[in-house]
A protein has these predicted regions:
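N-terminal accessory segments that position/regulate proteins before the catalytic core
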Residues: 1-40, 44-45, 74-79, 83-109
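C-terminal helix-cap and adjacent tail motif
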Residues: 11-13, 196-229
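Conserved hydrophobic/aromatic beta-strand scaffold that supports enzyme active sites
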Residues: 23, 140-142, 205-207
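Solvent-exposed alpha-helices and their adjacent loops that cap or buttress functional pockets
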Residues: 56-59, 132-135, 196-199
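Short loop-to-beta-strand entry elements in the cores of soluble alpha/beta enzymes
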Residues: 59-68, 179
Length: 229
């Protein structure tokens, strides 16, 4: 450990609570970015900040892969669409097999089938030259961790959420890409392309860049259901 990193904590808070709430509410999911590279120093700042995000049992086992190579991003996008195209056909065949056998289609399959319209749109979009996985973002951040650790999913999501907020302080915006997270842990071509350390899985994925659009309003949310006991 570097003892110089044990810095004094200032107990005073330099920002107002309402200002912080407004800042958090101002975070929006961005899917359109300028064709502008993100400086390495800014990425390093965000990565370094993740060191201080809490982890289960203080294990600190999560790792980050940052992809800026446009060719690699395009390959991963195409692999993801391939995966879901295969999944659509596979789910339909499985459901039909259950029906032909006079059996009830399992809930896990019927639930997955509700996503087929969305997945078909993704497949169709590619045919028209659209990139709807990473949205042509200049940076893809993949948060991965050993499966055999205290709280791998929590660790990665806490770190990625920290990035979504900190990025806004340097004029960057983000969006979570859950579709890729699912495919990355299932589809062999993606597994091989990422070549994660043995025993690791992807638990959170962000795209990041300078936003092309500016939002002028926050959005409303459902009231939080809470119990005070």
């Amino acid at each position: 450990m570097d003892m110089e990193n044990f810095i004094d904590i200032d107990s005073s808070v330099s920002f107002d609570t309402q200002d912080f709430i407004h800042f958090v509410r101002g975070r929006r999911s961005h899917r359109r970015f300028l064709e502008k590279d993100v400086p390495r120093k800014d990425l390093e700042t965000l990565v370094d900040l993740c060191r201080y995000a809490p982890t289960g049992s203080n294990r600190q086992t999560l790792e980050i892969m940052i992809i800026q190579d446009r060719g690699k991003i395009e390959r991963l996008s195409n692999y993801t669409v391939d995966f879901f195209e295969n999944e659509i056909d596979s789910l339909a065949r499985e459901a039909e097999a259950y029906r032909e056998a006079g059996m009830e289609v399992p809930q896990i399959i019927t639930s997955a089938l509700t996503m087929t319209d969305t997945l078909n749109l993704i497949v169709t979009a590619r045919k028209f030259g659209l990139e709807v996985i990473f949205h042509r973002a200049p940076v893809v951040m993949i948060f991965h961790s050993p499966v055999e650790t205290s709280c791998p999913k929590d660790d990665c999501v806490i770190a990625s959420t920290t990035v979504t907020l900190a990025a806004r302080t340097i004029n960057l915006e983000t969006c979570y890409i859950g579709l890729f997270e699912f495919a990355a842990n299932t589809y062999q071509p993606i597994v091989e392309e990422l070549n994660l350390p043995e025993g690791h899985k992807v638990y959170s994925v962000l795209i990041l860049g300078y936003p092309e659009l500016q939002f002028y309003r926050t959005v409303d949310r459902k009231p939080m259901r809470v119990q005070y006991l």
